[in-house]
């Protein structure tokens, strides 16, 4: 395995994508806009598309309103009132952490849109915002289950048709290569579905490699695979390796709560330099050799009660184990949340979150968040605001695109299937459980701290050799009928995601944002650019200057 060559032409490395005429399905629908994914970004996209009068279908891998990281827990929100000084401070606060790869114009756009939507969530969605002691309404965080319950109600009232437990398996394109819908499988009814649409919004989440973090069982990089199969590019994939702190006996990751913690070696001595924001690497290195313990200090009784009310599921595992985290030490681990709290994803080329493929839009964790955060987020706040904003922009734009096609063209154009790896093998189909081996190979290269957190050229090349061999194997034989097709596609998506991640990581020979190179520990000003990547059988990487998206699209 050799390092990716730079630069490489994007157009010359796009894979051929239209491989088969799409077959009719058990459930065959048409819509103006299809949204893939039912989390915050997906529901905002569906809502805003429907408000324009568009006919909208939303397909969720789980049950829309209860599946995914946000619905399972909750999150902070990057909500800053329209005060110039406050917003300048909020934007400047993360510039260095993100490696100066963000775009201030986009950050201001996100703050504007998030402010508007959070006001709307209370006034029109009935969300019960809490009040501060002085009576001010506090909109800096949402209780996930309540937030997503209300989002489901809102899109239903707007006329959106929801397909629950209906994972998408592939995108559809027309004869020109424009995205024209998607196809998938309804798990509970055990039947196929197809939606022919004027435009598609990818809001399927990022990739956490089935690490066990709460709510991340449905985010396996599917959207990135779908996008690559139709020729879209990815951006910031080297920034897809975020590890979050959790109690050893818990799947709940709450960085803000652990900011109140003190960390200890296994022998009880203080772990110097450890912290949930600046100092997680210290914890990760220690975990390579010993157990690490934490205790939530510096929290008064009133704050303890507030924390329990705000995120009760954080404390449930402690209660079950008879541990008071405020007075007792407890063992911790770090769970990979990959691009969920990272910034890598599908490349965006316009202000309305269009991709480079006509008819395809990306929102939330499916899309790159470099424009807002550069190479580091570290938590839900910025990503939550991005989900709200990008979903809004993508939903409205998808509706406009569909209207521009005209109803007749939208309904009558022939469509072609694009799914390859895990659906249509190039050789003899393998064992029905082959996906299990493929998943474990991907997890084995993506999860370990010494491979993905503390990166070196040698270790990344070794991982890529293993992943490339696995990709060749799955392209040749991986497939499964009916409900199991979801598993084979997840296996293919995680393998592809890891290959893109390490290929971009090899190309960035410096430490910037969350991308840490043991062999290149310093930031290199000469590498102040973003990295685009893509390709399926042959992965490519090329640098992109840091400049506004509107300029990139012109």
Write out the residue ranges for each language-model feature.
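N-terminal Rossmann-like FAD-binding beta1-loop-alpha1 element of flavoenzymes
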Residues: 33-58
